[in-house]
């Protein structure tokens, strides 16, 4: 490995690379979420027949993973670089390996393994065939071919590549703690994120108002349903994301039992499924505008028969 890229240079390099492969560069979605997969740029766009190629950085919050900034590798919030390509290119793995070369990682000089790890997200009714990518014994990426999203079978299949940016940067910069990662020249990761990490951990585990969170979950659930009754997919999905994050806060606080946990997940999943079905129906009303004319004509004609 030659130059040790800063965290922001890693992002810029991946953005330029995937832009060159035909991906749109999206921006992080402005609602809390546990993974880049939950962004509407993946969750909604992975369903239906329209093509979609996008790449974006997604800050991902997982309250139960907070460790007050005392653990060098486990975080309340981490950053994912998300790539979604639909339909999936036949050479997606080769494209991924080439992206590592752009980061200064020569696949011929390192032990890179694709370890089978099929993926499932019960709260959104999503699943797919997947692999973890291990670089010299450390997981740096999750590869997934979506088979189902929001309870709907995917056709065409979407390929998702999710880089764990903190892990990747730790490897490239050869540091043992994420807080020692150089974000930009002269600025360490910890100088930006250590204090928020501590505060969010303290809030999630000790301070959050359980009664308020329980009440908020009910309100967000009702508002999502109300928006769906009007066919308003995106506002509804925003409230699904709010339900998910609120549940994660309750879970971190130990406010839900094992039985209740399954019930909350089912409620979020049911909403996500309705959002998915409504999104495809609304795109159909628009004539699936991202399809080429020939494919659009065939699909719409089939539906008219």
UniProtKB/Swiss-Prot annotation:
Q: Which SUPFAM superfamilies match?
A: Class II aaRS and biotin synthetases
Question: Where the protein is mainly located, per its record?
Answer: cytoplasm
The protein's matches in InterPro entries, at most eight in alphabetical order, are given as:
aa-tRNA-synth_II/BPL/LPL (IPR045864), Gly-tRNA-synth_heterodimer (IPR006194), Gly-tRNA_ligase_asu (IPR002310)
UniProt catalytic activity:
tRNA(Gly) + glycine + ATP = glycyl-tRNA(Gly) + AMP + diphosphate
Q: Which PROSITE patterns match?
A: AA_TRNA_LIGASE_II_GLYAB
Family matches, as Pfam families: tRNA-synt_2e
One GO CC annotation, please?
A: cytosol
One biological process term from GO is:
glycyl-tRNA aminoacylation
- Which keywords has UniProt assigned to this entry? Aminoacyl-tRNA synthetase, ATP-binding, Cytoplasm, Ligase, Nucleotide-binding, Protein biosynthesis
Q: How does it assemble?
A: Tetramer of two alpha and two beta subunits.
| NCBIfam families linked | glyQ, PRK09348.1
Q: What is this protein called?
A: Glycine--tRNA ligase alpha subunit
Q: In the UniProt record, what gene is named as encoding this protein?
A: glyQ
């Amino acid at each position: 490995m030659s130059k040790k890229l800063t965290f922001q240079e890693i992002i810029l390099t991946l953005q330029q690379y995937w832009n060159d492969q035909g991906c749109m560069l999206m921006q992080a979605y402005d609602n809390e979420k546990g993974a880049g997969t939950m962004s509407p740029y993946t969750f909604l766009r992975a369903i239906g027949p329209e093509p979609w190629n996008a790449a974006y950085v997604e800050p991902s919050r997982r309250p139960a993973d907070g460790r007050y900034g005392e653990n060098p590798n486990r975080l309340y919030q981490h950053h994912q670089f998300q790539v979604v390509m639909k339909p999936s290119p036949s050479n997606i793995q080769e494209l991924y390996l080439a992206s590592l070369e752009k980061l200064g990682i020569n696949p011929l000089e390192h032990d890179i393994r694709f370890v089978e790890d099929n993926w499932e997200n019960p709260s959104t009714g999503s699943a797919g065939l997947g692999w973890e990518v291990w670089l010299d014994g450390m997981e740096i990426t999750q590869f997934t071919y979506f088979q189902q999203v929001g309870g709907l079978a995917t056709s065409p299949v979407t390929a998702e590549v999710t880089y764990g940016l903190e892990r990747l940067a730790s490897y490239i910069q050869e540091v043992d703690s994420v807080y020692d990662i150089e974000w930009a020249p002269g600025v360490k990761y910890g100088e930006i994120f250590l204090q928020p990490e501590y505060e969010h951990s303290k809030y999630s585990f000790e301070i959050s108002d359980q009664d308020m969170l329980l009440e908020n979950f009910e309100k967000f659930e009702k508002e999502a349903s109300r928006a769906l009754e009007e066919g308003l997919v995106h506002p509804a999905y925003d409230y699904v994301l709010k339900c998910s994050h609120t549940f994660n806060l309750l879970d971190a606080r130990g406010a839900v039992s094992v039985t209740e946990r399954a019930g909350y997940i089912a409620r979020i999943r049911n909403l996500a499924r309705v959002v998915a079905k409504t999104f495809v129906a609304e795109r159909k009303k628009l004539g699936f505008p991202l399809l080429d004319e020939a494919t659009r004509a065939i699909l719409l004609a089939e539906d008219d028969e």
